[in-house]
């Protein structure tokens, strides 16, 4: 099969992609300028479909709506870096802080520290 056809078959919209997320899933997103803001926006648009979805990342640069108190029943925020957008939710107990150096992140998953 031609790679271009395979690529075309996998194309989807953000709204369609986030419908695959189920309650209790873990979503690991890029951080800082690599944060997938369109996907996070689609997740927020669909938040009523979720309960207990864990969102893991380091530095959040966008609005981080999933950190807000009104979204606590939908999302558990697991921050690997306590930045400005996540600090309040960590201090209020609505988020988990997993301190980690950037170079250690692959080990969190390969050694099942974050199972």
Can you say where each PLM-predicted feature lies in the sequence?
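Conserved alpha/beta enzyme-core scaffold
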Residues: 1-115
